[in-house]
Amino acid sequence: MDARSPDLTTDAAGWRTDVPTTKSLAEVNASVALPTAGVWWRRLLAFVGPGYLVSVGYMDPGNWATDLAGGSKFGYTLLSVILLSNLMAILLQSLAARLGIVTDRDLAQACRATYSPAVNFLLWLACEAAIIACDLAEVIGTAIALKLLFGIPLIGGALIAALDAFLLLLLMNRGFRFLEAFVIALLAVIAVCFAVQIVAAAPPVAEVLHGFMPKSEIFTNPEMLYIAIGIIGATVMPHNLYLHSSIVQTRAYERNETGRREAIKWATTDSTIALMLALFINAAILVVAAATFHKSGHSDVAEIGQAFELLSPLLGLGIASTLFAIALLASGLNSTVTATLAGQIVMEGFLDLRLPSWARRLLTRGIAIIPVIIVTAIYGERGTADLLVFSQVVLSMQLPFAVIPLVRFVSDRRKMGKFAISPYVAAIAWIVAGVIVVLNLKLLADTLLG
């Protein structure tokens, strides 16, 4: 999988000499100015944004389905799995940010400058499949939200979802900071919606805190283990690693050792705080499911539409179901923005092929909408639930192809110099990568074998 073949020459850092260096997302690269002086929090605020764009992928409809299933069936027990998967995500996203800041390459560009053309083409195909699978989940989530809120049939909602292809174009024309503000505002809407539902559900605090402690029964109960693997598989998104390694470069930090060191510090802080928000939202979905469905004996709630119908009656709060659907719609809109960006980064990085963002969006979403319309027409809403699970399986299959190159690059002192991660951190990263790969392979095998 290396570029170490007779016909491919590399420089001292191990990058292929026949691959030109281009800026990642050139139209917004280094476009966000940083304060040259002042108190530390002003520097931090200037870096706030990329982490929140990344966090969007950690609360898409695939996460909702696994969190609902875990909470309704097993109460608060699987909160520890959500915490563990979030800690894994924090580590991997910090490594992605480090790679982008130090090498001035996103993960796709780093792969292209290291591996042979054949390997890069296969990696690109795998990543495109993952992005389309992610888009599939967004189409389903948006269509379900539109049906729950406005009574629009699922097929109509899926077609309406195609129109958001122009949302990113509109936001990018206003500047990258405007796009970040839009995403953060929708994340705030999601957080408020679930905060209200948690207050209404009034879960016992002691039981919730106890749920964050790992339990041996997670490994001894096959059904619980299956859902736990699903939670981890739905949490760590491969396209987020490509996305984060690129968008951290939108900051105009000094491209020298001092500037890069400070950028790594603030970018890691930004993504860690943002992913803690994702932890809250994922935990909130599970807690609401546990306090509402599990407590009342509804232990088989795994579908979003089913949860919507039961929430208000069980909570005794008329607006609860509406808040749930609003949060789902906000999640779908946010995921649209980040998946489009990730698609652009991957296509430009691996192939050096540049398409207008609206054309890129229409292509990806057009491919994703076809199976949604066919399955909905034949099998109805139940079919979309199965399709949602399938999209998570496809994402799981691609994950190793993003995680392994990332850990390998940031461990390489030739490529990273002084910024290469320590052997201790590298060991943890490889363990995390190994755990994710093994768990996702098990999830894939269990799903295919029924």
From Swiss-Prot:
One of its GO terms (molecular function) is manganese ion transmembrane transporter activity. Pfam families: Nramp. It is a multi-pass membrane protein. Keywords: Cell inner membrane, Cell membrane, Ion transport, Membrane, Symport, Transmembrane, Transmembrane helix, Transport. GO terms for cellular component: plasma membrane. GO terms for biological process: cellular response to iron ion; iron ion transmembrane transport; manganese ion transport. It is found in: Cell inner membrane. The chain crosses the membrane at residues 44-64, 77-97, 121-141, 152-172, 181-201, 218-238, 273-293, 310-330, 366-386, 387-407, 419-439. H(+)-stimulated, divalent metal cation uptake system. Belongs to the NRAMP family. This is Divalent metal cation transporter MntH. It comes from Bradyrhizobium diazoefficiens (strain JCM 10833 / BCRC 13528 / IAM 13628 / NBRC 14792 / USDA 110).
